[in-house]
């Protein structure tokens, strides 16, 4: 028993913690930051003000995490984020393909709790910052009301992943809030501040469920009345449907005309008013009798935020960087979501709930956007990085932010290792150290190759048991109507295009138009360049056609063989799935403002182009055709090019389908001491792994090698893995293997998918 008498006053418990890296904010950005820093040997304290990790992706808000893939509704092929956020997404898919937000919470908690070197403080709110001097943060002070504890957390380095930039703000860093003028950064899409507004608002979502019996609903007094008059989108089936819930109600947005930090409680109450009012309309207007058995299962208790402070960094990313896809010497991350701005009146605005304009491909984000010029031991990540309001419309999404989290966690861990400042990596030579470290963990930076002098692969002779020759896709016996223009997308080397043969059906005599296209901008996937056009007269029934193009292809690149829409034509289908090749369609995806093509108003600095996007499995099928001669688009030599996904080519080795024991052998003239092997597999970087609600048809990507073993020169098994589903496998040998040869034996995933590998690292 603990019994205490009266005293004049008491203080709550106080704990002091000293660490290397302090990460403030436990959203996806903060989680990736903390994990990356800890894996590189730094002691980390992760301070999160909520009871769970994940931020807007958590069960408290329930927004799906997305990034460059944009629901697979843009031209960013193979663009899903790599590195730690890829680990999170593939783990969630494996455990939780149905998209339960509560399960996603556990995925994040598991990863952080089982990572040595991280101290996690949940329900802990930072409220003040201490400084050693004008340019150096010494500590933060935080309070946990649940355990009545005050924490004084001292660190060498600080990462502000708080969403609102609280630590940067308290430390005195410069920031912006709202929109720049058009002339400030030559941004044609910068909004009219008075008419459109200059801040994005908050959102609260809700879930419903069918109880199987009638459920009445009595709305709270604060619920919005006369919803049809106040919310025009109720009359627009693109937005409102009684079958929608969760993320489909992203347009329930409010607060863009207010202070999205200090007015957040008022904004939340207004959003509750709207949510409960909409549910009252659904249940009690008498217009939807089919909803009699439905009840509210969940309503968000905190709003999901889109925008508040943006810190001023050494570089400010802007609209032109995104649309023109500028190259930066210090590129460390990338984006690909559309520039997505919302009217500040939010749910009460008339007209569209958002204005999305896409770039033709992914764009680089420079390191200089993650640090400022005033605090030497501070970096910032997430939606608060140094961008304009317009650029923030793209960079703010969670998977893009998470990429940046890994960047700043890695940078601060390297600072800790080398006893330097984050600004030191702005140097053109030093930035290569950071870029190399990021790439070695599977992090993707468009246009960069991993070059590591310490990698024993550099001096190895690489041989394969066989090599897959791409000669097209086998027919599965089924046909599908050519309702939309459809293209086979695959890479070719310089030289003459191979002939393409296929069997198509026609319901009546008609003409099939075939266009050979490519991306004018280089290594993109927007087929805006017409190379050659063919026309084929089809008779009713079966037609065997052979397409022979005259054009010489000048360089290694991706090409599109486009079969233009004709509803009288049936195209042959295939179940084959071959890495770095796919089938794309010129169709509509309203979820990301994809109407088949993009035609922006004149003068806003956005390009017009068509969208050619894949379908999702299981609906997605490749076009069955035969190539002659077959293409040599896979090679064991690609193991050395340092690119771990399709970019300009497959960048992969794939074994022949007839190979009963696909293997890759690395040989050295003398014995090597090998302590670590990293293998980089194909987990279909084209598939958007939305974390919640949508659900997926697979828990493991069908391209991924599940089972493999590694042997030395004597045939001794050094490692055996069964049931793999991850992109990067890191194998540690203790004691180290001493051998002059390593063989990696893969089992092909299925009869439709050859065994494939992107890259090998040997340490």
Stretches with model-predicted labels:
Residues 15-27:
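Beta1/beta-strand and adjacent pyrophosphate-binding region of the FAD-binding site
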Residues 475-491, 544-545, 651-670:
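Short beta-strands within extracellular/lumenal beta-sheet-rich domains
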Residues 503-504, 509-524, 579, 645-717, ...:
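Aromatic, loop-rich ligand-recognition surfaces of beta-strand-rich domains
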Residues 581-657, 664:
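PGST-rich, cysteine-poor low-complexity/disordered linker and tail segments that act as flexible spacers
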Residues 2, 8-10, 18, 36, ...:
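Conserved N-terminal/central alpha/beta ligand/cofactor-binding core
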Residues 550-567, 735-747:
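Noncatalytic modules at the cell exterior or secretory-pathway interfaces
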Residues 30:
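N-terminal Rossmann-fold NAD(P) dinucleotide-binding loop
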Residues 12, 56, 134, 139, ...:
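Flavin (FAD/FMN)-binding glycine-rich loop and adjacent Rossmann-like elements that form
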């Amino acid at each position: 028993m603990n019994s205490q008498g009266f005293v004049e006053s008491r203080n709550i418990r106080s704990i002091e913690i000293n660490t290397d890296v302090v990460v403030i904010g436990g959203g996806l950005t903060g989680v990736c930051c903390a994990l990356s820093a800890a894996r590189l040997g730094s002691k980390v304290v992760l301070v999160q003000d909520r009871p769970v990790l994940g931020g807007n992706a958590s069960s408290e808000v329930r927004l799906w995490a997305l990034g460059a893939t944009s629901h697979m509704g843009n031209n960013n092929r193979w663009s899903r984020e790599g590195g730690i956020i890829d680990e999170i997404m593939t783990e969630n898919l494996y455990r939780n393909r149905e998209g339960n937000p509560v399960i996603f919470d556990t995925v994040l908690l598991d990863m952080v709790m089982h990572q040595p070197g991280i101290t996690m403080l949940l329900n802990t709110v930072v409220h003040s910052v201490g400084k050693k001097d004008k340019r150096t943060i010494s500590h933060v002070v935080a309070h946990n009301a649940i355990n009545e504890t005050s924490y004084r957390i001292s660190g060498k380095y600080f990462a502000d992943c708080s969403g609102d930039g609280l630590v940067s703000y308290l430390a005195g860093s410069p920031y912006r809030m709202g929109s720049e003028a058009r002339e400030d950064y030559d941004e044609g899409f910068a909004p009219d501040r008075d008419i459109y507004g200059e801040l994005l608002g908050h959102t609260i979502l809700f879930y419903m469920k069918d109880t199987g019996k009638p459920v009445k609903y009595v709305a709270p007094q604060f619920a919005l009345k006369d919803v049809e008059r106040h919310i025009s989108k109720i009359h627009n089936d693109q937005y409102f449907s009684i079958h929608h819930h969760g993320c489909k109600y992203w347009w329930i947005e409010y607060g863009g005309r207010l202070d999205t930090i200090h007015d957040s409680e008022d904004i939340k109450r207004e959003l509750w008013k709207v949510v409960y009012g909409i549910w009252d309309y659904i249940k009690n207007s008498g217009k939807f009798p089919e909803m009699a058995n439905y009840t509210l299962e969940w309503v968000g208790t905190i709003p999901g935020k889109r925008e508040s402070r943006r810190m001023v960094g050494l570089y400010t990313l802007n609209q032109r960087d995104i649309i023109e896809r500028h190259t930066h010497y210090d590129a460390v991350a990338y984006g690909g979501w559309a520039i997505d701005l919302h009217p500040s009146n939010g749910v009460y605005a008339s007209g569209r709930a958002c204005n999305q304009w896409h770039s033709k491909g992914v764009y680089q984000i420079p390191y200089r956007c993650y640090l400022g010029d005033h605090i030497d031991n501070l970096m910032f990540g997430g939606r608060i990085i140094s961008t304009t309001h317009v650029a923030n419309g793209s960079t703010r999404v969670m998977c893009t932010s998470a990429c940046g989290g890994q960047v700043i966690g890695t940078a601060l861990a390297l600072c800790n290792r080398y006893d330097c400042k984050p600004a030191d990596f702005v140097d053109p030579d030093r930035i290569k150290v950071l870029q190399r470290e990021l790439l070695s963990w599977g992090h993707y930076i468009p246009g960069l190759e991993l070059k590591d002098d310490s990698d024993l692969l550099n001096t190895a002779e690489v041989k394969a048991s066989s090599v897959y020759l791409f000669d097209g896709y086998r027919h599965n016996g089924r046909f599908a109507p050519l309702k939309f223009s459809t293209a086979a997308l695959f890479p070719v080397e310089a030289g003459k295009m191979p002939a393409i043969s296929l069997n198509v059906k026609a319901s009546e005599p008609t003409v099939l138009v075939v266009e050979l296209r490519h991306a004018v901008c280089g290594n993109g996937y927007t087929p805006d360049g017409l190379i050659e056009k063919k026309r084929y007269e089809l008779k009713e029934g079966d037609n065997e056609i052979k397409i022979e193009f005259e054009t010489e292809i000048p360089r290694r690149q991706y090409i599109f063989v486009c079969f233009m829409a004709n509803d009288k034509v049936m195209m042959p289908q295939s179940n084959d799935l071959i890495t770095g090749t796919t089938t794309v369609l010129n169709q509509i995806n309203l979820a990301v403002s994809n109407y088949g093509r993009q035609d922006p108003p004149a003068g806003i600095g956005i390009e017009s182009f068509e969208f050619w996007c894949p379908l999702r499995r299981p609906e997605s099928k490749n076009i069955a055709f035969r190539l002659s001669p077959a293409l040599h688009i896979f090679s064991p030599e690609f193991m050395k090019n340092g690119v771990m996904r399709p970019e300009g080519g497959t960048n992969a080795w794939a074994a022949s389908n007839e190979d009963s024991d696909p293997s890759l052998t690395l040989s050295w003239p003398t014995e090597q001491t090998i302590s670590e092997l990293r293998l980089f597999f194909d987990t279909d970087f084209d598939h958007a792994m939305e974390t919640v609600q949508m659900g997926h048809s697979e828990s493991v990507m069908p391209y991924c090698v599940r089972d493999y073993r590694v042997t030395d020169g004597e045939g001794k098994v050094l490692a055996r893995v069964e049931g793999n589903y991850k992109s990067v496998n890191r194998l540690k040998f203790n004691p180290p293997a001493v051998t002059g040869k390593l063989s990696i034996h893969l089992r092909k995933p299925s009869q439709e998918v050859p065994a494939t590998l992107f890259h090998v690292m040997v340490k």
